Each structure stands twice: as structure tokens, then as C-alpha cells.
A protein has these predicted regions:
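Extracellular S/T/G-rich loop segment that most often corresponds to the catalytic His/Ser-adjacent loop
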Residues: 75-150, 154
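Acidic, glycine-rich active-site loops and adjacent beta-strand->loop/helix elements
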Residues: 31-33, 61-65, 86-89, 116, ...
Length: 191
């Protein structure tokens, strides 16, 4: 529920302010199917610029599943870490985005729980509501990356991505659904 221009403006702000605020991890819990190929390319270029600047970029796979090729942009970027929802992969609630991308990249990279998550909900009486989707899964992986960087601040974004891959728990599903598997925080932090 936003405009591509707003996302690109946010990416520029992050690049301009990452040193001042010590930004190391970027969570992107949005995605679009992009009606025009150019919009898709612009969003991909924006997140890849963040990645190339050394930031750990984690984006949602989107909720367009269960069909193949349903990962949304910017999660369809080859470089960044794309997250699906481990509890929205099968059955009637199989909405988690699946690869491959338009560029034949196997996505998502991994999955994390994202069903019935208590989260901030503007307009709710107490400010909270129960939400579901890959936008709820993505912050779990971004938070795991932040914990690892707190423990090992010298790690690069590529090293974080590889540690997530090495520590993910195989769910026995096709790679275009689960990627490397489900986030295993304990195993990840032990690497």
C-alpha cells in the first residue's frame, strides 16, 4: 500500500544516513507484483544498491503463492535475503511467495514463522493486532541478522547470508517453497 517512489526515497535516506545512525540491517516487509518491467527493475536496483553498500537487506517473498514464480519485488533480487513464511506453505493458507523469479533465481532464500503474529496495528484500540504473511516472517530473519552482527560486528552481509543458509532447518519441501529451509536461530547464533 505504497508508491515505488516512496520506497526509493527511503532507500536513498538509508544510504545517506547509515553511518550516522549505525544502520546495518534493512527490513523490507513490502512487495509488489509490478505491472511494468521497468518498475520491477528500479526496485531491484534500489535494494541492490543497499546490499552493495554493505547492508544486510532482508525482504518479504510476498503473499501471491502458491503458484511458482510468485515472489514479489524487491524480494526477487538475486543479491538480497528473501524470506517466505514457513507456516503459510501448505494447505488452504499456502500464500507464501515461491520461486523461481523472472530471472530464474531460486527464491525464497529461507522461511520463518509468519502466521498469527501479534504486531503493531495502527488504528487498533490497543495499537496491536494479529497479522499473517511474509511481512511478519521477514523481521524474524532481520532480527536474527542484527543479533549476529551484535555478536560478530566484523561480519559482512554476504557472510550473514551464508550463515543463514548453513543453519537453516530443511523442512523437506521443494527449494522454490522453502529455500534453504526454516530459520533456526539457535543454530545460526552458534556458527
Amino acid at each position: 500500500n505504497g508508491r515505488k517512489e516512496d520506497g526509493l526515497k527511503a532507500f536513498r535516506w538509508i544510504l545517506e544516513n547509515k553511518r550516522y545512525y549505525g544502520i546495518r540491517v534493512v527490513n523490507i516487509s513490502v512487495g509488489t507484483t509490478c505491472r511494468r518491467a521497468e518498475d520491477h527493475r528500479v526496485l531491484i536496483a534500489g535494494v541492490e544498491q543497499l546490499w552493495d553498500a554493505g547492508l544486510v537487506v532482508v525482504a518479504a517473498a510476498g503473499n501471491q503463492g502458491p503458484k511458482a514464480g510468485s515472489v514479489t519485488a524487491p524480494g526477487s533480487s538475486r543479491k538480497i535475503i528473501t524470506v517466505g513464511s514457513s507456516d503459510l506453505l501448505t494447505g488452504r493458507t499456502a500464500i507464501s511467495g515461491r520461486g523461481p523469479t523472472f530471472e530464474c533465481v531460486c527464491k525464497p532464500d529461507l522461511v520463518a514463522p509468519g502466521n498469527h503474529v501479534l504486531a503493531c496495528a495502527p488504528g487498533a484500540d490497543n495499537g496491536y493486532g494479529v497479522k499473517s504473511g511474509t511481512s511478519m516472517s521477514t523481521p524474524l530473519v532481520a532480527g536474527a541478522a542484527a543479533l549476529m552482527l551484535e555478536k560478530n560486528p566484523e561480519l559482512t552481509n554476504v557472510q550473514i547470508k551464508m550463515k543463514l543458509k548453513e543453519s537453516a532447518r530443511d523442512m523437506g519441501l521443494p527449494k522454490n517453497q522453502q529455500g534453504w529451509g526454516e530459520l533456526d536461530l539457535e543454530r545460526f547464533m552458534e556458527l
